[in-house]
Amino acid sequence: MLARYLNLIGRRSASPYRPQRLPAKFDNVIVAMSSGVDSSVAAALFAGEFPNTRGVYMQNWSESQSLDDPGKEPCYERDWRDVNRVAKHLNIRVDKVNFEQDYWIDVFEPMLRGYSEGSTPNPDIGCNKFVKFGKLREWLDEKYGTGNYWLVTGHYARVMQEMNGKGLFHLLRSIYRPKDQSYYLSQINSTVLSSLLLPIGHLTKPEVRDLAKYAGLPTAEKPDSQGICFVNNSQHGKFKNFLKHYLPSSPGDIITVDPQSGAKTTWGRHDGLWSYTIGQKVGISMPQADPNYQGTWFVSEKLRDTNEILIVRGRDNPALYSDTMRIENFSSLGPREDTINAFQNTGALTLQFRSLQVPVQIKSCKLNRSADNLDITIHLASKQRAITPGQSCCLYIDDRVLGSGPISHVNNNDTHA
C-alpha cells in the first residue's frame, strides 16, 4: 500500500521543496481518524509498514445532532462506529478522546460572539488551531512524550521542507486544488509541521478512492462530508436555523437607500445581523411590477449602529465589490521576520478569503507592526465580491501558506481603508 502511494507521488516535483520524510520503522505514528475515506486511507498507508501505528478519534460535540428530529442518530456515534470498523480492518488500536469543552470555549463561543456582532467567522479554522492541532497535541504529548510521535491527518494540504537555506518546514496547498484545505490550516502553530504527515495532500481525490478500494476499506464508498456535521444533521442543514437555538433574536429593518437623496425605505425585517451574510440573496417580496425594483436583491452591508441590513439589486451590483481590506492580528505560519520579508515582493503574493477560491492577486500592501501584532492593509489588483468582516484571509507566496488573520475592515475606495 505504502509503495503504491510512494510510486504515485514520486512523479510529482515540488522544487524548491522536498516532501516530509517518513517515520522510522518503530516510531509512534498517530492517525487522527474522522471516519471519512481520506483519514481512513491515511491510516492504511502507515498501518501496514509501521507497527506502532494507532488511531485517535476526537469527539468535539455531543449536543442533539438533530434539533428538529431528536430521534435521529447523532453524527458522532455513526462516525465512531465507522472509525472502529476501519481500525479493525487495519488491525490497529484506536483511542477516543473528548474535547467538547475545549471546542465550546475556544471555537463555538467565539463563533457565536462573532455572528452576534454581525461578522462572519470561520469555526473550521479555529477548530484546527485550538483543538485538532492544539488540544490533541497536548493530549499526545502527555501520552507519548513531546517529540516522540508523528501525527497523521487526512487533510488535503502538504508539509514540505526547504531544500536550501534554513531547511524550514512549510505548509503548501494540496496538489489537488478542488479539495485543497490549506486555508483551514493557516493558523496552526508552525512548530507542529516538523512532525506532521499529510499524505493525502499529495494525491487526487480519485487516487484516494482507488487506494481505499485497493485496501478494501469499509469507508471506500462513503460520501464526503459537507460542512459542520451537527449543522447538516439539524434544521435541514440550514445554518441560520441552527444559530437560532444559540443566539437571541434582535429584530431590525431590511432597507434600501436611494443613491441620490439618501432616503431609506424599509422592505422587511430580520431576526438579527447574524441571520444574513454579505452577498447573500434576500428572499423578501419586492414590487416586481416597478422596473426600479425588478430582479433579485442581495445583502451589501450590515449597519451595526442602527441594526439594519442594507440590500442592493443584482448579484453583480458594484456595491457588493471591494478592493481593499484590513487584516488585524495576522498570524504567521513560520518565523515572523520571514513572513515580513515575503511582503517585499507583492507580485508573488496571492490571497484567499474563502476556501477553494481562485487565488486573488495583490496590488500592494502596507504592514503595521507592533511587538505583539501584525496588521496588514491590502489593496487588490481587482475588486472582489462579498468580502466580509470576520472572514479569515489567508496569504500565499506561490503555493506556500504565509499565515492568516480575520478581516476587520472592507472598503470599496482604497483611499479610505
Swiss-Prot record:
SUPFAM superfamilies, per database record: Adenine nucleotide alpha hydrolases-like
Binding, ATP: A32, M33, S34, S35, G36, V37, D38, S39, M58, G154
Known catalytic reactions: 5-taurinomethyluridine(34) in tRNA + S-sulfanyl-L-cysteinyl-[protein] + AH2 + ATP = 5-taurinomethyl-2-thiouridine(34) in tRNA + L-cysteinyl-[protein] + A + AMP + diphosphate + H(+)
An example Gene Ontology CC term for this record: mitochondrial matrix
Gene Ontology molecular function terms on file: ATP binding; sulfurtransferase activity; tRNA binding; tRNA-5-taurinomethyluridine 2-sulfurtransferase
Major place of residence: mitochondrion
Biological process annotations from GO: mitochondrial tRNA wobble position uridine thiolation; tRNA modification; tRNA wobble position uridine thiolation
UniProt subcellular location: Mitochondrion
Keyword DNA-binding: no
Site entry (Interaction with tRNA), positions: H155, K281, Q391
Cystine pairings recorded for this chain: C127-C229
Region span, Interaction with target base in tRNA: 122-124
InterPro entries, per database record: MnmA-like (IPR004506), MnmA-like_C (IPR046885), MnmA-like_central (IPR046884), MnmA-like_central_sf (IPR023382), Rossmann-like_a/b/a_fold (IPR014729)
Region (Interaction with tRNA): 179-181, 354-355
Function: Catalyzes the 2-thiolation of uridine at the wobble position (U34) of mitochondrial tRNA(Lys), tRNA(Glu) and tRNA(Gln). Required for the formation of 5-taurinomethyl-2-thiouridine (tm5s2U) of mitochondrial tRNA(Lys), tRNA(Glu), and tRNA(Gln) at the wobble position. ATP is required to activate the C2 atom of the wobble base.
Other known facts: Present with 1510 molecules/cell in log phase SD medium.
Protein's recorded name: Mitochondrial tRNA-specific 2-thiouridylase 1
